[in-house]
Every structure is written in structure tokens, then in C-alpha cells.
Amino acid sequence: MSQSTNVTELARANVRALTPYMSARRLGGNGDVWLNANEYPLATEYQLTAQTFNRYPECQPKLVIERYAAYAGLATDQVLVSRGADEGIELLIRAFCEPAQDAILFCPPTYGMYAVSAETFGVELRTVPTKADWQLDLPAIKASLDRVKLIYICSPNNPTGNLINPADLRAVLELAQGRAIVAIDEAYIEFCPQASVSSWLKDYPNLVILRTLSKAFALAGLRCGFTLANSDIIQLLLKVIAPYPLSTPVADIAAQALSPLGLEQMRQRVSEVTANRAWLQNALQECACVEQVFTSESNYLLARFTASSSVFKTLWDQGIILRDQNKQPSLSNCLRITIGTRQECERVIAALAPLPGVDSPNSTNTASLRKETI
């Protein structure tokens, strides 16, 4: 090889071609109202109790596993802790997918890391877009299962906010029996705990559930997530996880967050976010520039605007950072708004209220659409 060869040519072809996931922090911005990453808006306070930093931590910190298992109503051998749910997404691909042979399947519009993780490992992407109501297209999924080893379904779905019909989830699990793992991403399940499918683990050996402390637990900066599955799957994932996925301080704070007091505080945050979401949803429907607000079971709202690009820039210029969803299938003119404090929600409405609607053939009945939610 010539000494002048560009070192990037040594990289795998799929990595050279990869477009990385554009996280909120990568996209940047200079705002003071950050409503683009589905974080809790206020910092939580913890004091470190573990002070032994000269030793490596446990691979699976015992207290964290015990407390999360109790919280989820599962046995400890059904729980794995990792660096965020994102690592759980990757661990499943590492354990179950042969590069250049197997495929994963997901249903856009949805979370972008499923695609990025698969592309990183050279695993084929198989997409089956959701129907107009953002529910699963079961016949299309059934027709697309050849060589699929993993199916990722986000419920509540990011960025749309809707729950996936439980009957459809069961149908996918049945279709995939003996051929694919079905991973249900429950990152936002604390905002609708009654919709969790964790109790289904006893019935479906191919079911995996992804969880996180980043949302309702207000610990996005901690990078701590969980994979829930039957013990056979957990043992496989333990073969491919890093030897020390959680640092000692992370495990310390995670255990505190899962204590009885930590769980009580989490539920108080959920109640507060839910109230602010209802307020923001009602207020958005009165804004002339808003065509539609979609019902959400999470800590964000998706709204369709008459001219989302100008709305996005107007708020950006005022230090209010939202998440543009225009590039997602079926989400033209849509912006996702994280539920912030009441004051932050009020700032959003104050910035939107003066903006005009658009009178054009494509925006007829805008006034009536604004009164609707889906």
C-alpha cells in the first residue's frame, strides 16, 4: 500500500459510507430553552456514596440490578444494565446478527439509532413504514421477514408519541416466533406505565424490552439503560457486553434513583410533565401557525406547522431549540417539542402566537385542523 494512501481507506466500506446519528448535542445551537432531546428540564441532585475509585466496578452492579428488577417486577436474571438503551440496541445486533447476511426490521418514522447501529455492523436494514395512523402494517411486516433476525418497535414511538396497539405487538411476536427477536423500546414507558409489555416475557421467549433512566428519571447525562429479557437472552448479551459498562459513580447514582425515594420523585416528575404536556397541547391548538397537534403518551409533542422551517428558525433565533422532523417519512412540516417547565412551555407559545398561518390550497381548513388531535 502506498504511503500516500488516505488512512480512511483502511476503514470498512460500510463505516466510510455511514451517516452518524445526529443527536441533539451534535446539531448544536446556542439556546437557553432546550426542547430538542426529550430530556427532563431540571437537574436532579445526588451525592456520591461510593468512594472506591481505584478498583474496577462490577460488570453488572448488584444493587442496581436488584432494584431495577424489583421496579420492573422481574427476576434479577432477566435484567441487564448498560450504557444507555442505545448500547442495548447494539448488543442485540452483536449477539444475533451475522454481518452481510442477516437483517433488522423497523417501522419509520421512528428512532434513528436502530438504523445507525445496524449499518455500523454491516447488517441490512429492512424498513416497513407505519400506516397513516402510525400503527404497524402487519401484512407488510409478515412479507418482509426473510433473513430478519431483529425487529425493533418503539412504543410510545419516538418521534410521533403514540402507543403501538398491543394486539399488533402480540401479532408481531407470533410472526417472529422461532425466527427473530422482537425488541420493544420502552424508553418513555414511565409516562404510560400501564402500556408496558414486561409481563409478556413469561409468554414470549423472543421478546426483549429496552428501558432507560434518561427520560422520566431525569438522568440523560448518566448514560444508564436496561435490557429486559428471559435469562437465556441475558446470558448471550453478557458475552458481548464490555467488561465494565457502568462506572462506579454511575452505578451509585442509578441505585439511588431506583430507591423508594427515587421512584417517588420520578413519579412526581411524570405527573408534572403530563400536566405541562396537556397545557402545551391546548395552547398549541390556538396558534395560527399550527395545523395539527398529535396526541402523545410521552414527554414530547409532535406538531405539524403551516411552515415548519420558518417556525423552527424563528424559535431558534429566540433561543428556543426544537427538533425538526421533516426528513422522517410522513412528517413533512412537523416539529417535535420536548415538554419543558411551564415557563419554557409559555415561552414557546409566546414565540408562536404572533406567527401567521398560511392561506393556500394546501392548507385549507387549517382552522378546523388546529382543533384536532390524533
From Swiss-Prot:
It comes from the Bacteria. Signal peptide: none annotated. It is an enzyme of class 2 (transferase). Transmembrane segments: none annotated. Its cofactor is pyridoxal 5'-phosphate. Gene3D superfamilies: Aspartate Aminotransferase, domain 1 (3.90.1150.10), Type I PLP-dependent aspartate aminotransferase-like (Major domain) (3.40.640.10). GO terms for molecular function: histidinol-phosphate transaminase activity; pyridoxal phosphate binding. Pathway: Amino-acid biosynthesis; L-histidine biosynthesis; L-histidine from 5-phospho-alpha-D-ribose 1-diphosphate: step 7/9. It holds the Pfam family Aminotran_1_2. Keywords: Amino-acid biosynthesis, Aminotransferase, Histidine biosynthesis, Pyridoxal phosphate, Transferase. Disulfide bonds: none annotated. GO terms for biological process: L-histidine biosynthetic process. The keyword Transferase applies. NCBIfam families: hisC (TIGR01141). Belongs to the class-II pyridoxal-phosphate-dependent aminotransferase family. Histidinol-phosphate aminotransferase subfamily. Homodimer. This is Histidinol-phosphate aminotransferase. The gene is hisC.
